[in-house]
């Protein structure tokens, strides 16, 4: 049927000409009456086809009443049968999308759930979202994220079945944050599109159309990604709210270099270097001079600064000053001023009890700050002045040990005083700790289980392919690594006595990835606690941990 014919039929409908059915569309607020054509209704909608061609109505019936969720939206749906545009309805977009699905489901029509993906439903209308989930299915990927991201913390879960609660619970907890990169407009830095994957199956939990940088942390208390972003000639901290896909900037966060989140999720710590000017030595080689270096401690709940701690003098006083071959610092008339390089931090770690902040600088100078007393507990230099190994792998901080992995050396420090307990001369690409005695040393195609106290290799486990970027989840003893095909591969360790290990690919093309323990933790705890009250066994409790990502 041509557009002109449909337009004429709708004109007849408005004028009440040559119509054979009066349809009354009723909701809780109004009744809309339309003069329509049975053949148009039956040909466009299975509900009306059954109504008119079944035994539900007398053949002489000229008026039918239907009760719907929203009469105005239903009128628009019927207008679409005639090829007409929608009337403008004074309700929010999210409400129109949800109620249109309800109305289309009532009429037996197909609906497009992709419109659900980015809507933001107010907490007082969460029941409406749950009702729509019952129509499209709780496992529909376009609504599942909304159910967990937008759930009010005080929501009555008795409105949701236990099976659906268990399904939603599986969408929280252990996750892989997979990053796919692209060059920024001016190619000054690289940004990534975030995709959240289930750590066991690799199934996509959530995607976002926003871009973040590699330097980020996940705020599990507020379900936000906090990252270092770039604006003109400065760097700053931005937050991406995963529930609404919206961004905002943290005030007083400029010239930021590093960020880390406390294990309890309450404090965000950032490190800032303010550059004063660029100076030149007698050979006209430039040197960026740092004006000040400081840590800022933010309250995660309101993003306000709790206190700041300046460390420029501490670094200048305790770090080794060295010559860099032909470009000698002594050749500069400003040799008493250290370049920005001396103040750059490679790793920032917080102890499990959130009491200590330990940092490793580019010069392999280490500093431990007591967060409670706001005092420097200890400083140390890992290498002598002439050591030129600048290839950093990763660091680990436990309650008793601080471990730093360089390309050809692993340092084990006593976290209470900074004393070096062990220097392990091994070429490696990273190290993870099983406990205070045993560590996992990572090589390109093998893993060495090593007892560092007794200087003994317990087991060497060979891999079938080269292992690239990697993170380790100590709670489940699972290692995640990327391979040559940009896929994430997981390795499950049963014990130390195995000769080989099996792998299972989490199929996803990625440039970078990070393991996250407590994705959407508040909702995770709420769902888990509810299931426990229903006499169900829950195994979803998570223990947070922090491991620096390997470059």
Swiss-Prot record:
Domain of life: Viruses
Disulfide bonds: none
Ranges of residues in domain BTB: 19-90
Family: Belongs to the mimivirus BTB/WD family.
UniProt protein name: Putative BTB/POZ domain-containing protein L76
Species of provenance: Acanthamoeba polyphaga mimivirus
Biological classification of the source: Viruses, Varidnaviria, Bamfordvirae, Nucleocytoviricota, Megaviricetes
